[in-house]
Amino acid sequence: MKRSFPLVLFLLASACASAPPRPAEPVHVVIVGTTDVHGWFNGHIETPPGGGAGVVWGGLPALASYVEAIRKENDGRVVLVDSGDMFQGTLESNMFEGEAVVRGYNILGYHAAAVGNHEFDFGPVGPDAIVRNPGDDELGALKRNAGLANFPFLSANMVEKATGKTPAWAKRYTIVRSGAAKIGIIGLSTPDTPNVTMGANVISLDFTDPVAATIAAAKELRAQGVDAIVVAAHIGGRCTKTDDPHSLESCDRQQEAVHLLEELPPGTIDAFFAGHSHSQMRHYINGIPTAQGLAYSREFSTIDLWVDVDNDKVVKSDIRPPTMICSFVYEGTDQCDPRSAPANAKLIPRAFLGNTMSPDARVAATVDPFLRRVAAKRDEKLGVSTTAVLKRGYSGESPLGNVIADAIREASGADIAVMNSGGIRSDLPAGELTYGDIFAVSPFDNYPAVVIMNAAQIAEMLRATTSGNRGILQVSGIRYTVDAAKDADKDPAVRNRVTSITLPDGSPLDPQKLYSVVMPDFIAAGGDGMADLMKSIPPDRVQIFYARPIRDTLVDVLKKWNRPLSPAVEGRITMLNLEPAK
């Protein structure tokens, strides 16, 4: 024993010498979050409504310069997360099924990303958005992207129906080191995923209660000794003001994220990055710092955590205002939103944390080849023009919705056309149109489907899409009226806000007649809450036309019309008692 004692002392001394020093003060860790990039790895060129200097807003090369500045400011103690819907939405991303975004994220150094509903949109690897050939894997494109990523795809509430376990290509959570702090990151997906993606692509998966999934994952992470837990969730909220993080007055308390956070026991998590709703959040909800920036790579969110690593807890937090992603700003504003630009304002370089922002060369070199490969198709002129911007709309009739509904109705020869507002992703700009303009409006690989329906089924379709927050159906061949105050106290499953449905001449639908209704195959497959209705319709009354996707059908009809498009709202949809935005 005497002879072994010096050896014990030596081993103890060696262990102490090799262990990292424990900081006397809390460790400051900065969490940076993006969400709903939707394939916009390149910036948007936008101009003020009244004319003037255009600005490039967003893009991964510009984002990289901000992230690097924050890393420099905080000695590298930065955790970078994304809250989902990374890939779907632009020609340059969709043509390569999201690969450009993954490769850009790899260079940026993301630590984790939540699985959003639109991650499933591409279906199998290749041009088909759903399985059409024996041996195709409906999750093939997503699995490929997960394999390319240097960071995990996370969802604690997504399980395989066959096993009840998380798919092999994803994880429930991950743990990263940031300085001396050990940070757990949980991912969540919206439980509504089967209704807001192509349902056939998630037929093997279940999306469970996110509250229970968060509590279970957090318990496991605490047992593994993490100092803080961050959630990246494709679950969102809506707040119209972000100036006072402690006031929820401007927030919709019925939104998914608010409900989830208010259900969590105290101390379950330490920070929450929301997504899915394309709106800003900067609020403490149930004591939890919660952040969400604008979609399409226009903003990022930041939460600062001060971590007591000796006691595995967060002792202080702060939510910074959402930060616009741009290398130039309008003088006197420190922002690049052209809607708020002063008249004739000039652009100046953006200063951030003492650094001048400019696109990161490494990220640009990674994504630029994808842009070059689609440039010719994107810039292809269609020989069609608009006299003014054709606006989309979510809660009422829109000029662009009318054009699309008219186009697919004419192309199909159907009696009636409906188009989900959520499938119209951009306004149509004024002037001569390109294929890229049409793609921005209709990026999803949806095809026209003609469904034979009776009057009661048409009424149920309109009822279901006006009973909640999904966005109403744009129409051609019918008119309808919605009273937003009607049945407010009823559950959305039975709420009926539709007060009238007529043909364009004002006559009612014939209850004994069958009508042909053209719609995106997404709706025909049960999307946007249509599952129960579509199951009630015999399969031989549904025909999907795979020859041309809706965007190319739109191009064909616009060329056939051969006339300038002018915005027009014609009274197809009448909205009563619609509350103005706060």
Give, region by region, the residue ranges found by the protein language model:
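Divalent metal-coordination and catalytic microenvironments
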Residues: D36, L63, D85, A113, ...
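C-terminal motif of bacterial Sec signal peptides marking the signal peptidase cleavage site
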Residues: A13-A15
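Active-site environment of divalent metal-dependent phosphoester hydrolases
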Residues: G39-N42, F87-T90, V115-G126, I130-V131, ...
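Loop/turn elements at helix/coil->beta-strand transitions in domains of secreted/extracellular proteins
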Residues: P26-V30, N74-V79, L108-H111, L148-F153, ...
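Core catalytic region of metal-dependent phosphoesterases/phosphodiesterases
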Residues: L60-A162, L261-P265, G293
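Functional cores that coordinate and move charged inorganic groups
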Residues: A141-L142, A146, K171-I183, T190-L353
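Bacterial signal peptide processing site
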Residues: A17-A19
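Catalytic centers of hydrolytic enzymes
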Residues: A24-T34, G39-K72, I107, V196-V211, ...
